[in-house]
Every structure is written in structure tokens, then in C-alpha cells.
Amino acid sequence: EIRLSLVGSEMCIRDSPYPAHLMRFKLPDDAACIMGHTRMTTQGDGKHNYNNHPFEGTAVIPFALAHNGVLYNDLTLRKDKNLPPTRIETDSYVAVQLLAQQGELSFRSIRSTVEPLRGTLTLSVLDSRDNLHIIKGNNPLTLYHFPRMGLFVYASTEQILKKGLKKGMPRMEQPFEVMIREGDILRIDRQGQYTVERFDTRNLWDGTAHFSWPYWDVYAVQNEYIDDLKSVAAAYGYTPHDIDVFLSYGLCPEEIEEIMCCGEV
């Protein structure tokens, strides 16, 4: 599933509960900041679009939030913090509710929102004033800056970011990486200036605790992924049988998609 948040003349979210590789986007000319999210379903059925990121919220001003990771104390926090009932099942949505409960969007309110969270996370929060907040927890994130273009681009890993830039903008200037540490809250404003403050990461999962999540079904997710690949195989010159052959060779669905789209792994 994929959703886009765009800030230009106004904030809007465009979304569909479909695999990202099936989506085609037409971006407004006045879009100044774009935040996208592709989701591997863990908690909350992705076929219900309200479960998919980025989520909308309001803390005096509208914002959109996306989360990379899994939280395992969301139900406890909803009860302890008296958060309003919601049909949204996704664990990440508790961060939206906590931030909205703060009544403002600031370093202080973001810090108060993320410090009680337990699990794995890196968050991005985009507000209607063109401010992008990146909250770096214990999940990866790579941020590039292209100074002459006044452009910031980020992705969960450097490998993904480089592949995306190679396909989308192959002749760009050489970027430099903006280094972000675990525990950083980085805000990039509409002028491209960035400010960093810190939050306490002690509640995040350290890899020693044992926990499990409801709705976690890796095999169901993988089977859906394979079905999606077979459904679009013909557009790339392959057949569903070819997908099965690749799988029999031991390739994972992600590697098969790379072969289909790029001709390489």
C-alpha cells in the first residue's frame, strides 16, 4: 500500500490500498514537500485504506505522520492516555493521537510523543507550514541534501535511496549526506534550514526483550506480494510461470521485482 502527503498551496493526502509498484503519480506543480510511505502490513489490514500511512492529524495545524517500525505498547498507551476510540487498527496511529493530544507541533511535543513508545521506530512528520520533522529512532534512515537544487531526499536505507535517484534523476549534482543519529529530532523548514534536538531512546526496543505482535503473518504478506508480481508480470515481458521459476531458484519476491523492473538484482 502507498500513500503520499503533499504540501504546496495546501496539504493533501493521496492514497490507494494497492502495491506501490502498481501506482502512477501525477504531482501538482506547486508541491513543495512530498512524503511517501510503502507499508508492509503487520497490524491492521492494508486493504482498509484507513490503516495505511501517512496518517492525518491536527495539533493546532494539520500534519501527516509516517512510521517505519513496529510498536508493541500502542494498546496500553491508548488506555493509559485516555486516547479516543478509532477504527484505525495500525499500531503506528497511537503516535498521531499522542501528538494531537499535545495540542501543538514542536520539538517539545514530539519529544513527549515518542519517548513513551516501545518497539522500533523512525518517524517523519510533515506539517501544513512545509516543515518536515524526521525523528530518528532505532530503525534506519538516510537523508541526502542537494544544495544547488535546494532539495532534500530521504529513504529508509542508502541503497534504496541511491536506486530511486538513479531511476528518477540520474544526472543530478553530487549530494552530501546529512548525518542523523539515533535520538535526533531533525526539522527542515520551508527555507531548507534544519535544526536538531534530542529525545530519550531508552524505551525503544534494545533487541533483548521478547515480544510478538497480533496480526503478524509474514507468509500471508509474502503470498500477496507474489500474487501482485504475477498480476503485472506480462507488462514486463514475463509470465506467472516465470515468477514460479525464479522462486524455485531461491530468489525472494524483492529480488524478482528488481529483475522485472531493472533487469538486475
Name the predicted role of every residue range.
Residues 3, 8-10, 14-265:
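Conserved short alpha-helical segments that host acidic/polar catalytic motifs at enzyme active sites
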